[in-house]
Amino acid sequence: MAEKRDYYDVLGVGRDASDDEIKKAYRKLSKKYHPDINKAPDAEAKFKEVTEAYEALSDPQKRAAYDQYGHAGMNGGFGGGAGAGQGFGGFGGGAEGFGGFDDIFSSFFGGGARQQPNGPRQGSDLQYRMDLKFEEAVFGKETKISYSREAECHTCHGSGAKPGTSAETCHKCHGAGQIQVERQTPLGRMMSRETCDVCGGTGKEIKSKCDTCHGTGREEERHTVKVKVPAGVEDGQQMRLQGQGEAGSNGGPYGDLFIVFRVAPSDEFERDGAQIFVEVPISFVQAALGDEIEVNTVHGPVKLKIPAGTQTNTVFRLRGKGAPKLHGTGNGDQKVTVNVVTPKSLNSKQRDALKAFAVASGDSVNPQDNNLFDKILNKKHKK
């Protein structure tokens, strides 16, 4: 048996290809090699190869398994892939390692009788990146998104057959969806069951294929869905929209859509969960004497009292002025760090006042009145 080609090479895309790039490559190649269009002897084999590659790389879990294990990750030999988690937090881990004795024989002999290839199959999951401004992530928003997906064919309603006709029982597997195959194994010649290569495991054979989908039962559509972004989401978090992925097969349900949030940084604030951080400059006079200053928060400006004698890098807490708690109630806090700023230049009155302050404090200081540039000028004037 010829060695399988790399799925990325089959589709002609790089390993860092986006979902849209993979889908475009598949559409182009599937049309090129579709047996109803291309009559070349190897067209059907290439069409199946392209379809197999797309089914693996268009599914986030299957693609992750393939990237890690190669073709071995596609036959169940490395345990379960990551299962899609509900709500937030990404894809939950679901790997369980090797299964029982039946799983070992399944990997040797093509799946065994436990598989139901002609049963309903859920459609592939999709991933969508949503870019949010800092404030949108804090307060949430409602919006609509549009994306391409494989949907049930509107002409044949997923049957793959021309309207007025129906699929017939497969002549090769007689409706079982599987065929018996004899092969040589380390234990000798064994009989195994594999998915029927004529009907693809459906048990049905389409003689008169739908003109719209060419018998696949699916077509590409531009799908629009409303999304309610919860207040308090963070960069990298995911939200699942059930049933908004691609169409299933054999009457199976649609897959899910995973929205990945990418939050732009703020020029003023930093954030860690529900806590928001900001730095505010104050003068050394404000720090020494105390003051009431205005501080910006995501909820609007508020007043903050600065006690007399405040030191630089002192942190103040504004309770309830942070971001909403995503998995709780109420808001977090905003922490304000004050930085005492030393003036870079003083006029004569300010300088005299500081000298008087130094004398009153008993400090012995040697003021550096002139900078290097001033000293050079003074030397020139003296000459």
UniProtKB/Swiss-Prot annotation:
One of its GO terms (cellular component) is cytoplasm. CDD domains: DnaJ (cd06257), DnaJ_C (cd10747), DnaJ_zf (cd10719). A zinc finger (CR-type) spans 140-222. GO terms for biological process: chaperone cofactor-dependent protein refolding; DNA replication; protein refolding; response to heat. SUPFAM superfamilies: Chaperone J-domain, DnaJ/Hsp40 cysteine-rich domain, HSP40/DnaJ peptide-binding domain. Induction: By heat shock as well as salt or ethanol stress. Pfam families: DnaJ (PF00226), DnaJ_C (PF01556), DnaJ_CXXCXGXG (PF00684). Coiled coil: none annotated. Its main location: cytoplasm. Residues 6-70 form the J domain. Binds 2 Zn(2+) ions per monomer. Its cofactor is Zn(2+). GO terms for molecular function: ATP binding; heat shock protein binding; unfolded protein binding; zinc ion binding. InterPro entries: DnaJ, DnaJ_C, DnaJ_domain, DnaJ_domain_CS, HSP40/DnaJ_pept-bd, HSP_DnaJ_Cys-rich_dom, HSP_DnaJ_Cys-rich_dom_sf, J_dom_sf. It is found in: Cytoplasm. The keyword GTP-binding does not apply. CXXCXGXG motif repeats lie at residues 153-160, 170-177, 196-203, 210-217. Keywords: Chaperone, Cytoplasm, DNA replication, Metal-binding, Repeat, Stress response, Zinc, Zinc-finger. The J domain is necessary and sufficient to stimulate DnaK ATPase activity. Zinc center 1 plays an important role in the autonomous, DnaK-independent chaperone activity of DnaJ. Zinc center 2 is essential for interaction with DnaK and for DnaJ activity. Belongs to the DnaJ family. Homodimer. HAMAP family: DnaJ. NCBIfam families: DnaJ_bact, PRK10767.1, PRK14276.1, PRK14280.1. This is Chaperone protein DnaJ. The gene is dnaJ.
